[in-house]
Amino acid sequence: MPPIRNTDNDRLAKTLGFECVQSTFGRAVARATARDAFLNGVDIAHGGFLFSLADYASALATNADGRTAISSGASIDYLSPCPKDAVVEAVATIPYSDERTALCEVSIASAESGKVYAMFRSRMIFKKKPQ
């Protein structure tokens, strides 16, 4: 995969161990493991971990064509608990985009079983190029 300046420099994603599996405009896959440090008080993956992975996948899917996209809003629905040590994949797709905005949908699921842990939606804004 060619480098993507905006996401290759994502220091939070690097700190959390997020991996870019695939990144093309319109579809991206990010992967991470729900390590012990990412668990909440009831010993399942913290919602912030899943949200951050989905947000990263959204960035991968919208920045892959060379434009700079930033999130202007996002929501998530948690559907089932994500256990410790689960390998999690966030698959982002873009059902709509134009020159200024893109809507991104992300399924967050077990890489092994396909069990869906959460669904995420975001609106991405493309920054204008300097005149």
Predicted regions and their residues:
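Beta-strand residues in well-ordered beta-sheet regions across diverse protein folds
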Residues: R31-T33, V91, E105
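Catalytic strand-loop segment that frames the active site of acyl-thioester-processing enzymes
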Residues: L12-A45
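Compact, glycine-rich, soluble single-domain proteins
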Residues: L39-A59, N63
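Extreme N-terminal tail/first-helix region
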Residues: M1-G17
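HotDog/MaoC-like acyl-thioester-processing domains
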Residues: C82-K84, T93-Q131
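Hydrophobic residues in beta-strands and at strand termini
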Residues: A32-A34, Y78, F126
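Hydrophobic beta-strand-centered segment that forms part of the acyl-chain substrate-binding groove
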Residues: A59-E89, I94
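A generic structural signal for short beta-strands and their flanking turns/coil linkers
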Residues: K14-L16, G26-A28, G47, T68-A74, ...
